[in-house]
Regions:
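Short, flexible loop/hinge motifs at secondary-structure junctions
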Residues: 1-180, 222, 251
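Catalytic center-proximal scaffold of phosphoryl-transfer enzymes
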Residues: 2, 28, 158-160, 166-497
Length: 497
């Protein structure tokens, strides 16, 4: 065996060193690749979590409808099967025994009477004799509308006085200002059609021109509405004060469009008065602009919009109809969680207990009942927290509040505002829901849906003046047309007398 020379050994060592260096480079590259792969996996997991959360949110949005949220029924895509929280009454449909009943009946003398003889008598020679002896066997009435346009000519008479020789001219009444003008009935009908009827200006023009045959431009319609609103400035201040003085006030807001931009109609009302205002802000600034809440100090029923809680002097009561809808949504999202179903039952039991107490002539619930409801409330909140724990702190800190989800947000709201949720069983003047205010602003949704938007803020303000006035009049038992006619005639305070 030949002996390895020193030169050969050095060469082998150099080759091995070079190979080791190459392997070190490969290892470093592989380590770098592994680190990059690990980071990619971390980023992918993060993306998957975010997408999973987004899918969950979108699924929840698709599941929202008019039955489990505040969305209007018109937005329902796949309309859900009817589901009511009301308990069966056990009564048969229709009128109940003992009720007075209503049917189509008008106590007016007929303008025209048509007699109908038997068909066989028409060609009989004794027809006239039989007709004179006939008696009425049955009466059927047809109620129809006949449109008549009444033109009243006002003529100013000129008289030469025989005593003084001076010529005198008769004066027109103050409200007769032009050679041709529209009367109060006509103006009231036009304004009512455009505002209360939610008919657009163009369609109002078509309807009026077609029915009455009277020329009427769209500009004249707008002027009629504006003049009517101008006469309501004083009554709006009275309505505002009446709402401020309420023992229980109802407050709500809804969106609309003015000149292509989002605005918010703020409603403030009580059982006798309705006050509507508009602002480009939904929150605190919009409420301040309405000039009702800043001066209100009694019980305010609302939907828990955060801006309401900035008013520290009022007593807050929450709309339980909103809460029931949110509980329905929770039940649909998490059918395995039974606390939402039991919480709905608790609220409805509280409502029923109050109704039974009122029917019995009581003005408060028994202490035992109140204690039972309190204990059930607290137990359900505790159970809800156990099934929906707070989110854990993440390793990577993020700015802002941790996202909790709708279910946990609802639980925390029910926990934090327990007194406001239950106020209706402690104060019988406080209603279970805020339906009164929701009814008062419902026409705004209809108007927006029909007309699309208001062209100007002035047009929106004038519309809300008229709707506030009409809403208040209807609560006093007056019809919308009667109210608008009185306003056009210059007597908007008529329903106070």
């Amino acid at each position: 065996m030949s002996r390895v020379t020193r030169e050969e050994l050095i060469k082998v060592i150099q080759e091995q060193s070079e190979m080791i260096a190459v392997l070190h480079g490969i290892i470093e590259n592989l380590s770098k690749t592994v680190e990059e792969s690990n980071q990619i996996i971390i980023n992918l997991n993060k993306t998957i979590d975010e997408l999973t959360q987004r899918v969950k949110e979108l699924t929840e949005q698709l599941g929202m409808n008019s039955k489990n949220s505040s969305k209007p029924p018109s937005t329902d895509i796949n309309k859900p099967a009817p589901k009511s929280l009301k308990k069966p009454s056990g009564k048969k449909p229709g009128g109940q025994p003992g009720h007075t009943g209503n049917h189509f009946n008008i106590s007016l003398e007929p303008d025209e009477t048509i007699f109908h003889m038997p068909s066989g008598c028409l060609s009989c020679p004794n027809h006239d004799i039989c007709l004179s002896r006939a008696c009425v066997g049955e009466i059927r009435n047809v109620v129809d509308a006949v449109v008549n346009v009444k033109l009243t000519a006002h003529q100013s008479l000129v008289v030469d006085c025989p005593l003084t020789g001076i010529t005198h001219k008769g004066m027109f009444p103050d409200d007769i200002k032009a050679k041709m003008q529209y009367g109060d009935n006509f103006q009231a009908f036009v304004v009512a059609l455009n505002t209360v009827g939610a008919v657009s200006v163009n369609r109002t023009h078509e309807i009026i021109s077609g029915i009455f045959g009277v020329p009427l431009s769209t500009g004249t319609i707008v002027n009629m509405v504006n003049r009517c609103a101008d006469r309501l400035t004083g009554i709006m201040e009275i309505i505002r004060q009446k709402v401020i003085e309420s023992e229980v006030g109802h407050f709500d807001e809804t969106g609309t469009n003015v000149g292509g931009k989002n605005h918010w109609v703020h409603g403030a009302s009580n059982p006798l008065f309705t006050h509507l205002s508009i602002s480009d802000k939904r929150g605190f600034a919009g409420m301040e602009a309405g000039k009702v809440l800043p001066y209100f100090t009694n019980v305010a029923v609302h939907d828990c919009w955060p801006a309401y809680w900035k008013y520290l002097l009022i007593i807050h009561a929450l709309c339980n109809a909103h809460i029931l809808r949110e509980l329905v949504a929770t039940e649909e999202r998490h059918p395995e969680q039974k606390w939402a179903t039991e919480f709905m039952k608790l609220l409805l039991d509280m409502k029923e207990a109050k109704e039974l107490a009122i029917a019995s002539g009581k003005n408060e619930l028994d202490e035992e009942q109140l204690l039972e409801f309190e204990l059930r409330y607290d137990a359900l909140i505790k159970r809800a927290y156990e099934e929906n724990p707070l989110p854990l702190e993440s390793e990577t800190k993020k700015r802002g509040r941790k996202k909790k989800g709708k279910t946990l947000a609802l639980i925390e709201r029910l926990d934090k505002h327990k007194a406001s949720v239950c106020l209706f069983i402690y104060n019988f003047e406080v209603p279970f829901s805020n339906n009164l205010s929701e009814r008062d602003i419902r026409m705004i949704k209809t108007k927006t849906k029909v007309s699309g938007c208001f062209r100007s803020i002035l047009g929106a303000e004038n519309y809300l003046k008229i709707m506030s006035y009409v809403g208040s009049s209807k609560k006093h038992g007056k019809s919308a047309y009667e109210a608008i006619k009185q306003a056009v005639s210059g007597n908007p305070e008529f329903f106070f007398t």
